[in-house]
Regions:
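Short, solvent-exposed loop/turn and secondary-structure capping segments
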Residues: 181-184, 192-194, 228-231, 240-245, ...
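Insoluble glucan recognition modules
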Residues: 1-211, 217-224, 277-287
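Short, solvent-exposed loop/turn segments at secondary-structure junctions
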Residues: 15-16, 176, 235, 291-296
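Short clusters of hydrophobic/aromatic residues that line enzyme substrate/ligand-binding pockets
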Residues: 26, 207, 259-260, 270, ...
Length: 314
């Protein structure tokens, strides 16, 4: 190999899905030969077969409505095993009564049973687990339940709403236990890979959870020139630093959101340009242009080839 590392991912069919949620890397430690072992749904890479746990396990449990889960196992599920499946709320240390029916040889639909007065409610911010007598337990992932109207937010104000006197931050995160805004005076320190991995040292301000799974915060001061990210904590104990998915300006390589007064960035006569009215958005035709491809030809007549400056030449 030209490198001692090999990046890879495993896909299902024609990219219907991929195993685990991110790319992985194999380390080629000795020579050009390496043997690895992979387990479906397990992000670890095993270099020795004896390290692999091949005992029967549940691969996934997807919460697809307020009462239904799709559970997949690594092996066939016998009819006699259906009554042993359990849904546990690990946050509240509580077990739900459920019923199970087979969808295929290795899939079941697990449904919450109605209680004396009503069906128990699922809180997407809690940590849930599905287990059974013959399969190792798996964590529940909130999937189509988040399409429920209770969590569907159709507002147009997610992200940062900036004014000179105050800034409002909104983040849709229905599975989060806690969310904080973290403010910085600079873009952070970059490592050799162009990433900012140390996000400590910022000013943390707790956000408030509102309807539809939206977290909100208003800061009554001028934040122009600051940088920010969100600190998101979950019921399973994990905490992630995440850039605002609705950020309109970011630092290099998208490591932190940048707080900018966009009115100050407008060129002269910016507001005097009138665009034709958009009568129907579905009639739009969008074109994509690459700066280099557009300008690099020797016959282009452009002096600053491959640069934005070249596109502006007259």
């Amino acid at each position: 190999f030209p490198s001692d590392k090999l990046n890879f991912l495993i896909r299902k069919g024609n990219w219907e899905d991929k195993d685990v949620g991110h790319d992985r890397t194999i380390e080629v430690k000795n020579g050009n030969n390496v043997e690895v072992w992979l387990i479906q749904g397990d992000e670890n890479i095993y270099y020795d077969k004896k390290d692999v746990d091949t005992s029967p396990k549940l691969v996934s449990a997807l919460m697809d409505s307020k009462i239904d889960l799709l559970v997949t196992s690594a092996g066939n599920i016998e009819d006699s095993e259906l009554d042993s499946f359990k849904l546990i709320d690990k946050t509240d240390n509580k077990e739900f009564k459920t019923s199970a029916i087979k969808v295929s040889d290795n899939k079941i639909k697990l449904t919450l049973k109605k209680g004396l007065f009503r069906t128990p409610e699922i809180d997407p911010s809690h940590d849930y687990e599905v287990s059974s007598n013959n399969f190792r337990a798996t964590k529940v992932t909130m999937r189509k339940i988040l399409d429920d109207p209770e969590y569907f937010y159709n507002g147009d104000d997610l992200g940062l709403t900036y004014t000179k006197d105050s800034s409002i931050f909104k983040l849709w995160a229905p599975t989060a236990k806690e969310v904080s805004l973290v403010l910085y005076d600079n873009e952070g320190t970059y490592d050799e890979n162009g990433k900012v991995t140390d996000n400590t040292g910022g000013r943390e301000i707790s956000m408030k959870k509102e309807d539809k799974g939206v977290w909100s915060l208003k800061v009554d001061e001028s934040l122009e020139g600051k940088y920010y990210i969100y600190k998101v904590s979950f019921s399973d104990g994990k905490t992630n630093y995440a850039i605002d998915p609705y950020a309109k300006a970011v630092s290099a390589n998208g490591q932190r959101g940048a707080i900018i007064d966009f009115s100050s960035t407008n060129p002269s006569e910016w507001g005097s340009v009138k665009k034709p009215p958009m009568l129907n958005p579905t009639d739009s035709i969008l074109y994509e242009m690459h700066v280099r491809d557009f300008s690099i030809s020797k016959d282009s007549g452009i002096n600053n080839k491959g640069k934005f400056e070249g596109i502006a030449e007259e």
